[in-house]
Every structure is written in C-alpha cells, then in structure tokens.
Amino acid sequence: MKGLKITAAAGAMTLFFASMAYASGDSGHGPDWGNFAFRVVNFVIFAGIIWKAAGKKIVGFFTGRRQGIEQELNDLETRKTEAKKQLAEVERRIANLESERQAILADYRAQGENIKAAIIDKAEKSASLITEQAKRTADNEIKAAIDAMRAQMADEIIVAAEKLLAEKLTANEHEKLIDKYLTKVVLN
C-alpha cells in the first residue's frame, strides 16, 4: 500500500514538472490548464476505480509474487548449500581415492599372502604325509624282506643241521638226543 502511494505521488510530480517545463517553452501561447486538469482528474478517477475494483487482487498478486520469489530464493539457497556439500563430499572422495586404492591393494595382497601360506602349508602337510607313508611302506617292505630272509635262513639252517647231524650222529645217538630234549620240554 505504501509503495502504491509513493508511485502515485511520483507519477503526479512527474506530470506536474513536465507540464511546467512545457509551459516555460517559447511557443507563444500557454498551456490549456482546463484540458490538463480534466486529464489529471480523469486519471485519478480511473486509477481510483481500478484500485477499488482490483486493488486487493493487485496487492495479493504482488504479495504472492514476492512470497513466491522469496520461496524460490530460499529453495535456490538450500539447493546451493546441498550442492556445496555434495561437491565437498565428491572432492573428499577424490582426495581419498588414492588411499582407498592403496588400502584395497594392500587388502588383496594380504589375502593373496594368506592363500599362498595356506597352499604352502597344505602342500607341506601332504608332502609330510607322503613321506611318512613312504617310510612306513619301506619299513614294512624291509620287515617283510627280513622275515622272508629269516624264514629262508631257518629252513636252510634246519636243512644244514639235519644234514650235519645225519653225518655226525648215528641213529642210536640221535634217539638219545631226542629223548633228552623231550624230557626237558615235558619237565619245563
């Protein structure tokens, strides 16, 4: 409302000073003050009618427009703040990108070393089991060979002993020897 009064006063003063400037000219005849007064009154009546008929709507329009502009400026300020935050976040992430890359590489290297150690450990255990199994197999084969050799040697000793006894002992001595050992076996 105050702005409208100031605008109306400024318009009236502009018309007044313009008419004064026109009147000071060398045209030879003065202005038609009656026509000028009629025009001013006509303008004031026209402006008053427009103000009465649509004054509230005009004020509401400009007030609504003003509030809309203020709201839009607030929204733009909020969006600007959000954009600055997002920009700062992106810049921070870009700055941290190298350290993140190094961390990821270090993590993968550590995982690789762990897998390598697990594979080596498994291979060592498998080699140990294979070596132990080979030792057992070799021991069993040696034991079997020794047992076979003992059995063969026992057979050969028996054959040699029989042959030797058959050559040195007579049948009578042989029977005495058998009786003697049978008596020992029975008594024990």
UniProtKB/Swiss-Prot annotation:
Its main location: membrane. It is found in: Cell inner membrane. It comes from the Bacteria. Disulfide bonds: none annotated. InterPro entries: ATP_synth_b/b'su_bac/chlpt, ATP_synthase_B_chain. GO terms for molecular function: proton-transporting ATP synthase activity, rotational mechanism; proton-transporting ATPase activity, rotational mechanism. It is a single-pass membrane protein. Keywords: ATP synthesis, Cell inner membrane, Cell membrane, CF(0), Hydrogen ion transport, Ion transport, Membrane, Transmembrane, Transmembrane helix, Transport. One of its GO terms (cellular component) is plasma membrane. The chain crosses the membrane at residues 7-26. F(1)F(0) ATP synthase produces ATP from ADP in the presence of a proton or sodium gradient. F-type ATPases consist of two structural domains, F(1) containing the extramembraneous catalytic core and F(0) containing the membrane proton channel, linked together by a central stalk and a peripheral stalk. During catalysis, ATP synthesis in the catalytic domain of F(1) is coupled via a rotary mechanism of the central stalk subunits to proton translocation. Component of the F(0) channel, it forms part of the peripheral stalk, linking F(1) to F(0). Belongs to the ATPase B chain family. HAMAP family: ATP_synth_b_bprime (MF_01398). F-type ATPases have 2 components, F(1) - the catalytic core - and F(0) - the membrane proton channel. F(1) has five subunits: alpha(3), beta(3), gamma(1), delta(1), epsilon(1). F(0) has three main subunits: a(1), b(2) and c(10-14). The alpha and beta chains form an alternating ring which encloses part of the gamma chain. F(1) is attached to F(0) by a central stalk formed by the gamma and epsilon chains, while a peripheral stalk is formed by the delta and b chains. This is ATP synthase subunit b.
